[in-house]
Amino acid sequence: METIHKKSLSRSPRDMFFIAALLVTAVSVLFWSMPLMAASQKYFPSPEDALKGLVEAVKAKDKAALDQIFGPSGKELRSSDEVQAANEFEEFTKHVAEKTSLVKENDSRVIIHIGNENWPYPIPLVKKNGQWFFDTEAGKEEVLNRRIGEDELTAMLVCRTYVKAQREYILKDWDGDGILAYAQKLRSDPGKRNGLFWRHAQGEAASPLGELVAQARIEGYKKEKTVFKEQPVPFHGYYFKILTKQGEHTPGGKYDYIINGNMVGGFGLVAFPSNWGKSGVMTFIVNQRGKVYQKNLGPDTMKIAQEMQSYDPDETWTLVKE
């Protein structure tokens, strides 16, 4: 652990999104599996002692100690995606083990930097009445912004991956009905290949959505009860739903993608946050043309997206740049 020093760092946008994937964890992740106690927040005699307390609690996975370190405000920063949270915590622990340092902003505010890349921790250390504490309330907006940014980037990536998967799926009659068509489901029914993902034995053809699902399995979304359960499980804070129509604001006009039971006219997808304002803000849509559009649907995002059937980006939707 290094002592306090003054340092200025320049970071690219890519760096900042990488930070989001890792450093939000010690706040949002460490609380995901524990009830928040009513105990008052812990204060430390120095920034060095505060950093030492955080590092020891993280390494020991001591959630009770972390509860005291971050105080009651930590409850608002819990991640709704337990699998994502657990994996991010492991990643965070690894970077804490690499290196930690303290960067002095002024006599009463210090920022912790973590890992070999010196990523700034979003919760500042603040001095009050001669004691130091983690000002969770002050860092709350930054924590949520980082989480939302990372989740939204993942949702956009899934939209583009979905387009590639559908383009691959239609090249072969996977369901054996004699018709080349797009998949109407994200996951196949057990024992079938009527969706973009299916389980396959060694030597058999992998599903078009294999890479995405493989990544999900690596991150913990691998138990049968979560992969195949009827109740949807958010992936990095987002739900995904196939759209089977397009509206009047789309090239080609309004029509159904499904003809005589087969989706041959095109395909669409909507990606929307599972917890608007916390896991994401923007809703994303894409169709066979591969252009992703975004829009903030507001607090009623869940209801609006669940009722959405058509890909129809009017002037209120914004094109997402590649």
Predicted regions and their residues:
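N-terminal secretory signal peptides that target proteins for export/translocation
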Residues: 1-16
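Bacterial N-terminal signal peptides
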Residues: 19-32
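Short, low-complexity N-terminal intrinsically disordered segments enriched in polar/charged residues
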Residues: 36-60, 103, 139-164, 168
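Short, well-ordered alpha-helical segments enriched in acidic and aromatic residues
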Residues: 62-74, 181
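Surface-exposed, charged secondary-structure patches
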Residues: 71-121, 229, 233-234, 246-248, ...
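Short beta-strand edge/turn micro-motifs at domain boundaries
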Residues: 110-153, 157-160, 291-296
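Flexible, glycine-rich surface segments
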Residues: 169-278
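C-terminal soluble interaction/assembly domains
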Residues: 265-322
